[in-house]
């Protein structure tokens, strides 16, 4: 729907508005001939905005006269914490009792003028030849030539069966869970939850929940029902409370097979995981490693979309440095920078998009190889099936429950997610939901990955 702005003496302009706007037939005919502006077609609150390519495709229409993303900058202010540190803050942090929220932190850049990951994705859709974008892509490809070549060689090296049980690259505990890789304690969990983004918490009317890709309307239509956010639906389904039950452990031919079931409490749906663990060597003279094959088989009726399907590894220590092959910039199914692939490098603590309120914001797609270096040596991840990844010192639940980064615990650990998929980001904080084409839908899938600890000298 649209209304006609006739305030200009020379040209009337059609301005799209809420789908429920009342427009008479005569005005509608004039609107169809007028130039049009897309007002607040995307909203830049939190992780995002996403979905820009769909709107960029509309801009070649001869009547199109421009559009606006809301908005340019986060409205956050410095606050001095009791320990003397300063933090960007909002709402009730300054005694505001009525409007305590981070909804004024909705900029393409933060309060210090630093672009968010979603901003680069938006630029890539709207102005792919922008010099600033070209510089950002080059800067993200920060790994050295030597690191690039080494990871490429590792990713392409054949695996050799490892028969030396005295130097096993892994151990399982009595319940069939991975207890260590190399001599490093490691915990692996299934994850189908993420810390809700501001868009996941959005309650606007452009909601695609339950709509599949075969029943799509035009951009910005959806269900037309406001009120319930994806975050509320995921919480109601208790996706953050998955529980594990061991089914069986078998061993034969050098392979250990573990079958387990995961489900939320009191749910009539869940997933059966079948793990196969085998010791291997990366090349004839390379390090010992663990080959992991995982079959994911959902049962029951899952929610129509889930935040993610992935593995969460917990590693000791927090001072890790990452080098990887794959997408070098943060991205999601509906929020990415085409061409930003190569060899990235950076401290693990710097690989998350830090919005004012903690939320999901560190996913990178298309992982080919990952090296994490810390006090315990090097931790290698070599995927043999499509995976995205992210790292954070905090779990999904800890991020979801925190209102500020300074509220999070200071613990010596690192979480590494290896994701089969994540739900799209969308822009539903004040705009359209994630489109069904990029929805996270639980499904049967096989995952294959090689994991190794390379001990330091």
Predicted regions span which residues?
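Beta-strand/loop-rich accessory regions of lumenal/periplasmic or secreted enzymes
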Residues: 149-150, 154-457
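Extended substrate-binding grooves/exosites of carbohydrate-active enzymes
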Residues: 1-158
């Amino acid at each position: 729907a649209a209304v006609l702005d006739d305030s200009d003496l020379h040209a009337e302009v059609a301005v799209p508005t809420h789908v429920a706007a009342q427009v008479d037939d005569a005005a509608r005919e004039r609107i169809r001939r007028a130039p049009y502006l897309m007002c607040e077609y995307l909203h830049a609150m939190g992780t995002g905005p996403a979905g820009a390519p769909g709107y960029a495709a509309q801009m070649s229409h001869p009547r199109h006269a421009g559009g606006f993303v809301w908005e340019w900058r986060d409205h956050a202010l410095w606050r001095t914490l009791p320990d003397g540190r300063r933090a960007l803050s909002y709402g009730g942090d300054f005694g505001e009792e009525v409007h305590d929220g981070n909804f004024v932190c909705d900029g393409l850049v933060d309060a210090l003028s630093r672009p968010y990951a979603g901003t680069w994705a938006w630029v890539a859709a709207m102005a792919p030849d922008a010099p600033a974008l070209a510089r950002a892509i080059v800067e993200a490809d920060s790994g050295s030539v030597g690191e690039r070549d080494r990871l490429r060689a590792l990713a392409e090296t054949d695996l050799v069966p490892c028969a030396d049980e005295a130097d096993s690259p892994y151990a399982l505990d009595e319940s069939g869970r991975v207890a260590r890789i190399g001599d490093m304690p490691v915990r692996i969990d299934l994850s189908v939850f993420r810390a809700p983004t501001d868009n996941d918490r959005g309650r606007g009317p452009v909601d695609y929940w339950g709509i599949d890709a075969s029943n799509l309307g035009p951009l910005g239509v959806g269900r037309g029902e406001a009120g319930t956010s994806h975050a509320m639906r995921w919480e109601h389904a208790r996706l953050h409370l998955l529980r594990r039950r061991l089914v069986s452990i078998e061993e034969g031919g050098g392979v250990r097979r573990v079958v387990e079931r995961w489900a939320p409490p009191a749910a009539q749906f869940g997933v059966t995981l079948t793990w196969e663990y085998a010791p291997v060597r990366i090349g004839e003279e390379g390090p010992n490693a663990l080959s992991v094959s995982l079959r994911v088989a959902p049962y029951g009726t899952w929610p129509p979309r889930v935040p993610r399907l992935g593995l969460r590894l917990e590693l000791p220590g927090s001072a890790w440095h990452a080098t990887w092959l794959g997408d070098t910039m943060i991205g999601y199914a509906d929020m990415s920078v085409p061409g930003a692939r190569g060899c990235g490098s950076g401290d693990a603590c710097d690989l998350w998009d830090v919005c004012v309120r903690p939320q999901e914001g560190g996913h990178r797609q298309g992982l080919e190889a990952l090296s994490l270096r810390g006090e315990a040596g090097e931790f290698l991840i070599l995927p043999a099936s499509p995976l995205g990844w992210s790292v954070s010192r905090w779990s999904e639940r800890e991020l979801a429950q925190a209102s500020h980064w300074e509220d999070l615990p200071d613990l010596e650990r690192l979480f590494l997610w290896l994701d089969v998929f994540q739900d799209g980001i969308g822009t539903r904080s004040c705009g359209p939901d994630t489109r069904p084409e990029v929805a996270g839908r639980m499904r049967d899938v096989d995952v294959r990955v090689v994991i190794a600890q390379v001990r330091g000298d």
